[in-house]
């Protein structure tokens, strides 16, 4: 006889994320039959700053309160319509629950009830089920095959939409590839992070942090950042390449201008002008603006990879530039991870298109891009079955929730992005991975 743990209540509320903006928290209560034992699962929903055009829709109120960012309408959907449909369902039937949520919304982009409504409920159901079974979440999601700790890609220098500086590329990460265990990896990253703070201070640069806990100082370009990171790595006593590698998120869609088909670098342009340099692409006005074509973007990445141990580039080109992505993949596929975030948006249809076109070799997984746990896990399965790496990722607007730490272990992702070893909403994930690593293979 199959176990029956029936949902008795679904309750949503408005809470604050790490940027002080409203987001959704959901509690699902279920009762085990015939014992009558009640269990609660609670989860919250993150929010991104630089979002892909093809992401599922995050609903906001658009009213005066919270500058239009309130989610009271989403909470209302959860507490009325969604609750009415889910009460009585078996909380163990995750696929059926998620199908019901998608059916209730009735749109391709979750624009009716909101991806933030669906995701909060979906994740809370999974948490409630694992609690009801007295089973760790990663084990409930991944079964006995969940046994691999993920390598952290730690965002220590922030730019782009995550910081107010001249850095056009969004994230610069250190990756402790030489670590023998997750505790070692986290220690190495934290040590380098603190040495980086000292170096920035000595150089007279700001050590204020951005949304993801990384520092947000002024640099003119990516090469300056990597040179500074190299100094921090060496000062911490580690070897470039064998101990520590680099990764970056270009977030190129944020730089792309659809009118001229070029990538515009306003921060680098300002930095060049401030030191009376003109390193720009020649243009008719000769105004010193830094503009790059897709080919020049790829050449820049090749230069960086020759000079530094760069093992991963995320969103190296625009989310619609499939031809450019094919060229990027042809030239760099054997040298590094080419990660699609805005390109794929955790969407099975777009991932399948990328596979068919031989575009990229890795997929960034953000559960709120698609709206339900089942759809996210389908995306991971499709990627891994076709030889693509899966990188589990946070968002820039996070909460103290650590669901993605368990998810990364559950699917043996091998890689996780959850910011710098700083700020409570980031360290919550790292600390959960420390706990999980005690029962995992090294």
What are these model-derived regions, one by one?
Residues 135-153:
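Glycine/threonine-rich beta-strand-loop-alpha-helix active-site module
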Residues 1-23:
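Short, Gly/Pro- and small/polar-rich lid/capping loops
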Residues 24-32, 43-47, 154-176, 248-267, ...:
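Short beta-strand elements
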Residues 223-442:
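Catalytic core of soluble alpha/beta enzymes
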Residues 15-26, 109-130, 151-167, 211-215, ...:
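Conserved phosphate/anionic-ligand binding catalytic regions in large, soluble enzymes, centered on
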Residues 46-131, 135, 186, 214:
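Metal- or metallocofactor-binding catalytic centers and their adjacent structured scaffolds
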Residues 147-210:
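Mobile "lid/hinge" segments at catalytic clefts and subdomain interfaces of large enzymes
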